[in-house]
């Protein structure tokens, strides 16, 4: 019976280094969501959207106006349908 490490000394060293890296990474990760930066404020949500994202960039105020205009157009169409149904 041989008492040497399976795979040799290099494999043992690689295992030790991998374990040390794993422990170091575990120590660096925050333990709670608040430590991770998600403290319940809306600023943490805004960090998810960066300028590096591809696609159409639209100001939030423009989106708000378009949404309100859409709601008003639906209401106007309902009113027109009711009025035209009573006239004709």
Swiss-Prot record:
<feature type="transmembrane region" description="Helical">
    <location>
        <begin position="61"/>
        <end position="81"/>
    </location>
</feature>
<comment type="subunit">
    <text>Heterotrimeric complex composed of SEC61, SEB1 and SSS1.</text>
</comment>
<keyword id="KW-0812">Transmembrane</keyword>
<keyword id="KW-0472">Membrane</keyword>
<keyword id="KW-0256">Endoplasmic reticulum</keyword>
<feature type="region of interest" description="Disordered">
    <location>
        <begin position="1"/>
        <end position="41"/>
    </location>
</feature>
<keyword id="KW-0813">Transport</keyword>
<dbReference type="GO" id="GO:0006886">
    <property type="term" value="P:intracellular protein transport"/>
</dbReference>
<keyword id="KW-0653">Protein transport</keyword>
<keyword id="KW-0811">Translocation</keyword>
<dbReference type="InterPro" id="IPR016482">
    <property type="entry name" value="SecG/Sec61-beta/Sbh"/>
</dbReference>
<feature type="topological domain" description="Cytoplasmic">
    <location>
        <begin position="1"/>
        <end position="60"/>
    </location>
</feature>
<protein>
    <recommendedName>
        <fullName>Protein transport protein Sec61 subunit beta</fullName>
    </recommendedName>
</protein>
<dbReference type="GO" id="GO:0005784">
    <property type="term" value="C:Sec61 translocon complex"/>
</dbReference>
<dbReference type="InterPro" id="IPR030671">
    <property type="entry name" value="Sec61-beta/Sbh"/>
</dbReference>
<keyword id="KW-1133">Transmembrane helix</keyword>
<dbReference type="Pfam" id="PF03911">
    <property type="entry name" value="Sec61_beta"/>
</dbReference>
<comment type="function">
    <text>Necessary for protein translocation in the endoplasmic reticulum.</text>
</comment>
<comment type="similarity">
    <text>Belongs to the SEC61-beta family.</text>
</comment>
């Amino acid at each position: 019976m041989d008492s040497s490490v399976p795979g040799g000394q290099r494999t043992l060293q690689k295992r030790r280094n991998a374990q040390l890296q794993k422990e170091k990474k575990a120590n660096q990760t925050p333990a709670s969501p608040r430590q991770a930066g998600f403290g319940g404020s809306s600023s943490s949500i805004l960090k998810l959207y960066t300028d590096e994202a591809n696609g159409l960039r639209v100001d939030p105020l423009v989106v708000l106006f378009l949404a309100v205009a859409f709601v008003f157009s639906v209401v106007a169409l309902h009113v027109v349908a009711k009025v035209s149904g009573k006239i004709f």
